Amino acid sequence: MRVRNRKGATELLEANPQYVVLNPADAKGKWQELFGNDHPIHIEVGSGKGAFITGMAKANPNINYIGIDIQKSVLSYALDKVLATDVPNIKLLWVDGSDLTNYFADGEIERLYLNFSDPWPKKRHEKRRLTYKSFLDTFKQILPEKGEVHFKTDNRGLFEYSLVSFSQYGMKLKGVWLDLHASDFEGNVLTEYEQKFSSKGQVIYRVEAVFQ
């Protein structure tokens, strides 16, 4: 999600260390200690303005959530939502999520969410897609055995590519939704993009893939 630079974004992030972890590499292997409990940890790579991560945290108080985004302005808007919601089970990371092993130990994360990731439609940019093999390698490392990746997109090309990528990697497709909002799936928490696209009648695709 690209947004204009927000004046004061850096200062806002730095002023809220209770939610924004500025040196996440130091927390590697210690995230439950940082949260102050032994609850499972779920992360969202590319958390945007925070609608999904705050909604999930509010609905599931016994799960810890970490939202990751490289854009400080976007993350500052997510922080606004966190502060307004006042949920204790969220941390935000202002980092590049290309190698999550820099921040999380093996098996430290229970579940990973990819919501409306950049489709990078050109073939020469395939390696930048978050469901490309090299990303799956890092996801598998920080997730436990049978760890899950939950993926949503409005881009059919990326969806089909991801189904193939997951399958070729040897992952089990636990669930596939070709039109999420027309299905009987319960508990869906919308992202900002999802709210925008679905209101225009855009089909939303979803898959739950499990490492074997």
Swiss-Prot record:
Substrate binds at K122, D154, T191, E192, Y193, E194. It catalyses: guanosine(46) in tRNA + S-adenosyl-L-methionine = N(7)-methylguanosine(46) in tRNA + S-adenosyl-L-homocysteine. The active site is at D118. Residues 124-129 are annotated as: Interaction with RNA. Keywords: Methyltransferase, S-adenosyl-L-methionine, Transferase, tRNA processing. Pathway: tRNA modification; N(7)-methylguanine-tRNA biosynthesis. The keyword S-adenosyl-L-methionine applies. PROSITE patterns: SAM_MT_TRMB. Pfam families: Methyltransf_4. It is an enzyme of class 2 (transferase). The keyword Cell cycle does not apply. S-adenosyl-L-methionine binds at E44, D69, D96, D118. GO terms for cellular component: tRNA methyltransferase complex. Its EC number is 2.1.1.33. NCBIfam families: PRK00121.2-2, tRNA (guanosine(46)-N7)-methyltransferase TrmB. PANTHER family: 3-DEOXY-D-MANNO-OCTULOSONIC-ACID TRANSFERASE/TRNA GUANINE-N 7 - -METHYLTRANSFERASE (PTHR23417), PENTACOTRIPEPTIDE-REPEAT REGION OF PRORP DOMAIN-CONTAINING PROTEIN (PTHR23417:SF14). Catalyzes the formation of N(7)-methylguanine at position 46 (m7G46) in tRNA. Belongs to the class I-like SAM-binding methyltransferase superfamily. TrmB family. This is tRNA (guanine-N(7)-)-methyltransferase. It comes from Streptococcus gordonii (strain Challis / ATCC 35105 / BCRC 15272 / CH1 / DL1 / V288).
